[in-house]
């Protein structure tokens, strides 16, 4: 009976668990896992092929080879289950226990675990407070370590060489002190550590010491010791006395044909360990000489090292073929390791793959599945059906039936796949639209048919792409596939909320051709009663598609919505001036859209907008139907259009010859100048490249103008210009294929080409493809083409790696609640650069939730309440009432711990509604940023010479009409001529409209002359300010007489004569070129008033001192009277070095990795007044005195551009030395919001340049993850260590606990971690280990005895549970609630029993089972 019960017990559900703990195993634990000791290195008997007894594959230890059969064959069959054969000692059970039973090896001498020794920082070193080098010398028998000094002056854990040891023994006598070698010595040291006492000591020393280095060292050691104390792990367990042996099925020995065996490398490594161990045992029994034993112990240590992590120390052990053996560590790490190969990426059954072809007749939610493929994929379903229908009695019979492919099987297949969606996936799956569900339609042939509109989402084309098909098996899976993944439910890109089902190429061309209008087309001016009349006229060739006609068109307007939210429509008939094509197309327009959306030429962008409008106004279902109809019409009409390409369509502009000869003449001129030494070679090259670049643009412009328009005769007989019907122009203009740049190469000139190293070849290709290239031109062209291919390969790899890092850092960010109740947010404005609105306010706030009321600026009434999700209609309203700043919620300020709340995230862009709880917004953000990565460039842009000179502006003018306003940072003085001279470094001028809304903003540089006043009303085109673009002035802010200091000709300044004008100026000499004595002198000028007293800065005791920088041209004389706003000196900016600007993918990676740029800008640490201190060698000392009078010093390299001057008041976080900003500084000085602005804007700049749209919130989500750790500043009464880095949520939890007890909470500073670092420092060690640096992560986690709470998605995928996102979140929540309820019930029962004083029953057989965690 018991056996029967056991049978039922085996199919138990696996235990539920909520966390996984990792730790060090004690020797007892290892022995408890083991089923026996492996004593021999033998594997299997070469004659019988049976495992050797006590060997590495021993059946007695690890279990039988065949199910329910012992080795010698005495016991066979199920009835003997559990019997242990008395002859061969094998237990009769399932053979699969050989996958789970472990053995062990009793080591004759203890050995150190290499991970805790060599994985930096060395954990052994930290615990023992010894250096790694010393420990290694002891372990590998090169030195002794003192364990017990006894009465001798030696110190504990002192290292001595063998000669020293012998000498000391002679000196103090044998046995006076104890010193040992090898792992035994280290083990004894570890045993002797009193952790409690050590911790007290370190804490005391931490309080006492002041040195940074010591604090760091102590804190590290304290952390490790406290971890040991907390986790109950003993330090001596880092030394192995027993070595576990992996189950044999996990390191198999496979017979190959030809009598040889393929074996796992682990067997070789284990064999080595066993051999050396046995030899050592024998030597110890024989009492061999110490030196031989030592050598054997060292070899054993090395063998164990190799088994655990081959190659970590010394040379890697190699097999017979000189290849390093694959150790246990290599099994789990890297791309092919256990984590990434088998746990995160599994192969799936019920899947197939095939080539895709276009399926133009499919509906959007369908795909064509080849019959044979479907038959194979749905086999089990067919078997089931055959059995239930009684056609086959057994599975075997059903199999036969299916293989013979009888008609009944095909009927059943049709039935089985009806309403059963399949999932199609195209690799690489870069975002969630890379895998979508479709309803299969059975087709003949062997290729999968794909709907043309989903190609954009899959990034698929039909040039031989393959796709994989997966079958969702369970009912839940089918339901999720249908509701969440069906192609018709995924019509928007999650990255930006634009429609993903936009037609392209031939469809666009067909729609564009149909909706173009033509002057004097056949039948122009006719009027039609309705659309059917138009169609009749068109089919009888009375009118052509593009003719302008008048038609009565019926539009349907929404009257009201009924109770279900379905709209009611009322027809409205109007006579519209339109074209034949547009009116025919209007038949497919969904109800509720006005005809005006179609009444224009439909280019690709217009079609996208049209589908977007349909989605917002008519809903998903109508949009999908409309898109399908558009597709059909487009295909049909494209064939009607008859657009083709001929060589005559490529019109070469007649001006081309002249433009090229002019350019060549200019180039000759520069060559002459270079020959006569007027310009350098670099300048000549820059100018030549510039000239040819401009020439190419001119040719291109001339060509486009010629292509764009054609002359036609209208009805009155006059000649007028109309947009051209040139085929090539129409293809480019409609957005179907090709671009102006490509047409330029066909009919203009190819232009400048780059060498493989990125530099531009100065002779351009003046020919185009129509004229043909000569051999040289062709050769130059091949350079560029080849570089393009090489770049693409690099780019794909880099982009994939960026995506992987992004996913890893955000994978655990899930929407876990609807509202966190925060009142924080960020104020959004339109993004303006150089006076142009780059991104309008409406685009930035669409789909966000307001955090403050939006107030109408005119009436001061609340227009939109707090907590409203801004949809299209509300943003229109905000635009209309003229609000220019809206405060919205953002993922950065969300107060939810371990996740995000829906309100802070806002709209789910892929669905168009407020985000649902359980949405994995982190992964979506990572995919949205990573997916377009392959479109970004890999190159760094060289800017220099001519290219940047052309871009230097010297004035700024208003683009809009309105009122000028200056920002608070704008400071200016009025000079004697009455001009306003700017003396602030960060002043900006805004132009506001009548409502006071900001229309544009312009930076006004220092020294510029303002041409407008604050509050002045101006017209568009008014100049606001002018300045000299080539020099930077130093302007006097006060009036007085100059008094030079340290301005000595030949010492600090040199006289420079201008050859042309004959005037002389003084130039400040670089300090490096001066003599030693004069190096510290700073040329500067002070001002004297009428009484010859130094002019003071108002309100202080500082004299006005104006320093001259290196290279400054001093324009005033000593003793000269100067007035406010007068220029004292000029610094030429011409000497700006050509600097590389990192662009494209590397720039994005740099921002997300939070790398500090080299030559970063220096920001003011405090608000205060600037002064200059005494200079040191090569550095200038800048002092900021804050409001309390404390001085903060900065040392700045002399060649750096200092942006501030003596006496200037700077605000905290203001830039004082020029350079690229360091994100860490921004965070420290300006806070999280500024940092977020900086990263978002910089990342967006890169993507915008490539024309890629990504919503800001995705970048904010990543920044939130980069900021999730904080550094403890003041510990308070918490358990933290000062300077420790912890998760923000952990700190908040701990602070809540402390505050609840009425104690002092800890304070913290924000930390910015790069995405790699943030991924590795996550709380989940499983997630971190599967990302990078597996060994280090696991070593650290084991010592800390870490517990992984399985919060993120990755950890759950790895342990094989449902992920806590989407439906999984609900599942886990329900499970936890159920468990809590059960616990409460159990508690209640036990309480009741207590109260009744009933002795609980003794027998509790069923209670204890299934409770294991």
Curated annotation (Swiss-Prot):
Its cofactor is Mg(2+); Zn(2+). InterPro entries: DNA-dir_RpoC_beta_prime, DNA-dir_RpoC_beta_prime_bact, RNA_pol_asu, RNA_pol_N, RNA_pol_Rpb1_1, RNA_pol_Rpb1_3, RNA_pol_Rpb1_3_sf, RNA_pol_Rpb1_4. Zn(2+) 1 binds at residues 70, 72, 85, 88. GO terms for cellular component: DNA-directed RNA polymerase complex. It comes from the Bacteria. Keywords: DNA-directed RNA polymerase, Magnesium, Metal-binding, Nucleotidyltransferase, Transcription, Transferase, Zinc. SUPFAM superfamilies: beta and beta-prime subunits of DNA dependent RNA-polymerase. This is DNA-directed RNA polymerase subunit beta'. It comes from Cupriavidus metallidurans (strain ATCC 43123 / DSM 2839 / NBRC 102507 / CH34) (Ralstonia metallidurans).
């Amino acid at each position: 009976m018991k056996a029967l019960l056991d049978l039922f017990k085996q199919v138990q559900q696996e235990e539920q668990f909520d966390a996984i703990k990792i730790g060090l195993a004690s020797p007892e634990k290892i022995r408890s896992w083991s089923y026996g000791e492996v004593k021999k290195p033998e594997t299997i008997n070469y004659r019988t092929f049976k495992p050797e007894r006590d060997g590495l594959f021993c059946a007695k230890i690890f279990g039988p080879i065949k199910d329910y059969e012992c080795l010698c064959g005495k016991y066979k069959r199920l009835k003997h289950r559990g019997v242990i054969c008395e002859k061969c000692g094998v237990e009769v059970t399932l053979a699969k226990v050989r996958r789970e039973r472990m053995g062990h090896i009793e080591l004759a001498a203890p050995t150190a675990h290499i991970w805790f020794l060599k994985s930096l920082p060395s954990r052994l070193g930290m615990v023992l407070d010894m250096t790694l080098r010393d420990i290694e010398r002891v372990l590998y028998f090169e030195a002794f370590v003192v364990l017990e000094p006894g009465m001798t002056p030696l110190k504990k854990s002192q290292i001595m060489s063998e000669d020293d040891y012998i000498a000391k023994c002679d000196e103090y006598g044998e046995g006076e002190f104890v010193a040992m070698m090898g792992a035994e010595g280290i083990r004894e040291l570890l045993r002797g550590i009193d952790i409690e006492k050590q911790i007290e000591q370190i804490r005391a020393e931490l309080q006492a010491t002041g040195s940074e280095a010591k604090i760091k060292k102590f804190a590290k050691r304290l952390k490790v010791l406290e971890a040991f104390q907390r986790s109950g792990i003993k330090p001596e367990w880092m030394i192995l006395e027993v070595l576990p042996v992996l189950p044999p099925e996990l390191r198999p020995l496979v017979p190959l044909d030809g009598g040889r065996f393929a074996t796992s490398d682990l067997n070789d490594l284990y064999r080595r360990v066993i051999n050396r161990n046995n030899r050592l045992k024998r030597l110890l029994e024989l009492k061999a000489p110490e030196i031989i034993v030592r050598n054997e112990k060292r070899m054993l240590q090395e063998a164990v090292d190799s088994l655990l992590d081959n190659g970590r120390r010394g040379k890697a052990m190699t097999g017979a073929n000189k290849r390093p053996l694959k150790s246990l560590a290599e099994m789990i790490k890297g791309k092919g390791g256990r984590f990434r190969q088998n746990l995160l990426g599994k192969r799936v059954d019920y899947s197939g793959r095939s080539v895709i072809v276009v399926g133009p007749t499919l509906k959007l939610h369908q795909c064509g599945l080849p019959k044979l493929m479907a038959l194979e994929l749905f086999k089990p379903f067919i078997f089931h059906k055959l059995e239930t229908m009684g056609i086959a009695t057994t599975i075997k019979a059903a199999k036969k039936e299916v293989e013979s492919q009888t008609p009944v099987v095909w009927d059943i297949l049709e039935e089985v796949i009806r309403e059963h969606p399949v999932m199609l996936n195209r690799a690489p799956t870069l975002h969630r639209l890379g895998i979508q569900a479709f309803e299969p339609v059975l087709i003949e042939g062997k290729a999968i048919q794909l709907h043309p509109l989903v190609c954009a989402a899959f990034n698929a084309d039909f040039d031989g792409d393959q796709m994989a098909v997966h079958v969702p098996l369970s009912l839940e899976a089918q339901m999720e596939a249908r509701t969440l993944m069906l192609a018709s439910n995924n019509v928007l890109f999650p990255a930006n909320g634009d429609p993903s089902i936009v037609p392209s190429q031939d469809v666009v061309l067909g729609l564009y051709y149909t909706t173009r209008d033509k002057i004097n087309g056949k039948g122009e001016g006719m009027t039609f009663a309705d659309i059917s009349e138009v169609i009749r006229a068109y089919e009888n060739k009375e009118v052509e598609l593009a003719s302008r006609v008048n038609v009565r068109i019926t539009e349907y307007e929404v009257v009201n919505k009924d109770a279900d939210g379905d709209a009611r429509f009322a027809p409205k008939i109007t006579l519209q001036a339109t074209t034949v094509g547009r009116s025919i197309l209007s038949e497919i327009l969904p109800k509720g859209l006005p005809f005006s959306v179609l009444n224009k030429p439909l280019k690709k962008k217009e079609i996208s907008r049209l589908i977007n409008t349909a989605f917002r106004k008519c809903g998903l279902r109508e949009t999908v139907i409309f898109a399908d109809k558009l597709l059909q019409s487009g295909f049909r009409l494209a064939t009607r259009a008859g657009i083709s390409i001929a060589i005559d369509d490529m019109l070469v502009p007649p001006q081309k010859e002249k433009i090229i000869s002019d350019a060549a003449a200019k180039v000759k001129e520069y060559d002459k100048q270079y020959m006569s030494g007027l310009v350098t070679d670099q300048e000549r090259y820059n100018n030549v490249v510039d000239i040819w670049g401009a020439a190419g643009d001119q040719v291109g412009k001339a060509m486009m103008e010629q292509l764009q328009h054609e002359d036609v005769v209208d009805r009155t007989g006059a000649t007028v210009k109309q947009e051209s019907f040139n085929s090539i122009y129409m293809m480019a203009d409609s957005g179907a294929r090709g671009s102006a740049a490509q047409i330029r190469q066909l009919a203009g000139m190819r232009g400048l080409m780059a060498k493989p190293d990125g530099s531009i070849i100065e002779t351009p290709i003046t020919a185009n493809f129509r004229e043909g290239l000569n051999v040289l031109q062709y050769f130059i062209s091949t350079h560029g083409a080849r570089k393009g291919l090489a770049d693409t390969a690099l780019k794909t790899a880099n982009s994939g790696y960026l995506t992987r890092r992004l996913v890893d850092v955000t994978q655990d960010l899930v929407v876990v609640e609807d509202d966190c109740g925060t009142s924080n947010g960020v104020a959004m404005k339109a993004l303006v650069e150089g006076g142009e609105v780059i991104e309008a306010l409406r685009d930035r706030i669409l789909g966000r939730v307001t955090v403050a009321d939006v107030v109408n600026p005119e009436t001061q009434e609340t227009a939109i309440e707090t907590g409203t999700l801004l949809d299209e209609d509300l943003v229109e309203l905000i635009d209309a009432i003229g609000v220019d700043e809206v405060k919205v919620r953002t993922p950065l300020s969300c107060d939810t711990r371990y996740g995000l709340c829906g309100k802070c995230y806002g709209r789910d862009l892929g669905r168009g509604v407020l985000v649902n709880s359980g949405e994995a917004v982190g992964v979506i953000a990572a995919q949205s940023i990573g997916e377009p990565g392959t479109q970004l460039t890999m190159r760094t842009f060289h800017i220099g010479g001519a290219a940047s000179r052309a871009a230097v502006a010297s004035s700024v003018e208003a683009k809009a009409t309105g009122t000028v306003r200056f920002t608070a940072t704008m400071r200016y003085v009025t000079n004697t001529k009455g001009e306003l001279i700017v003396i602030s470094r960060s002043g900006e001028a805004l132009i506001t409209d009548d409502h006071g809304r900001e229309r544009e903003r312009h930076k006004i540089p220092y020294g510029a002359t303002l041409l407008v006043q604050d509050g002045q009303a101006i017209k568009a085109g008014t100049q606001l300010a002018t300045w000299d673009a080539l020099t930077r002035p130093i302007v006097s802010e006060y009036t007085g007489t100059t008094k030079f200091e340290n301005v000595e000709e030949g010492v600090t300044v040199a006289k420079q004569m201008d050859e042309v004008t004959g005037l002389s100026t003084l130039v400040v000499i670089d300090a490096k070129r001066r003599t030693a004595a004069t190096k510290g002198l700073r040329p500067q000028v002070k001002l004297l008033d009428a009484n010859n007293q130094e002019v003071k800065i108002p309100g202080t005791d500082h004299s006005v001192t104006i320093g001259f920088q290196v290279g400054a041209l001093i324009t005033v004389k000593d003793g000269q009277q100067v007035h406010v706003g007068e220029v004292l000196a000029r610094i030429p900016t011409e000497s700006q070095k050509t600097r590389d600007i990192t662009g494209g993918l590397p720039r994005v990676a740099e921002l997300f990795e939070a790398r500090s740029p080299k030559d970063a800008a220096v920001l003011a640490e405090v608000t205060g007044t600037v002064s200059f201190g005494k200079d040191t060698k090569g550095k200038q000392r800048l002092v900021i005195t804050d409001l309390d009078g404390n001085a903060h010093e900065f040392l700045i390299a002399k060649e750096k551009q200092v942006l501030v001057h003596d006496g200037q008041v700077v605000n905290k976080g203001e830039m004082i030395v020029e350079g690229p900003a360091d994100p860490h500084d921004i965070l420290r000085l300006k806070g999280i919001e500024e940092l977020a602005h900086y990263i978002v804007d910089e990342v967006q700049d890169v993507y915008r340049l490539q024309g890629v749209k990504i919503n800001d919130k995705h970048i904010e989500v990543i920044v939130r993850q980069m900021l999730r750790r904080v550094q403890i500043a003041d510990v308070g009464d918490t358990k933290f260590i000062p300077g420790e880095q912890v998760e923000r949520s952990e700190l908040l939890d701990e602070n809540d606990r402390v505050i609840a007890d009425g104690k002092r909470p800890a304070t913290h500073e924000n930390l910015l971690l790069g995405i790699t670092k943030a991924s590795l420092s996550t709380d989940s060690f499983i997630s971190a280990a599967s990302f990078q640096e597996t060994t280090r992560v696991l070593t650290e986690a084991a010592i800390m005895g870490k517990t992984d709470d399985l919060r993120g998605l990755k950890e759950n995928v790895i342990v094989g549970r449902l992920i806590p996102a989407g439906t999984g979140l609900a599942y886990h929540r329900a499970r936890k609630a159920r468990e809590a309820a059960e616990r409460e019930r159990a508690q209640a029962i036990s309480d009741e029993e207590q109260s009744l004083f009933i002795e609980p029953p003794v027998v509790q057989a069923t209670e204890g089972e299934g409770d294991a965690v």
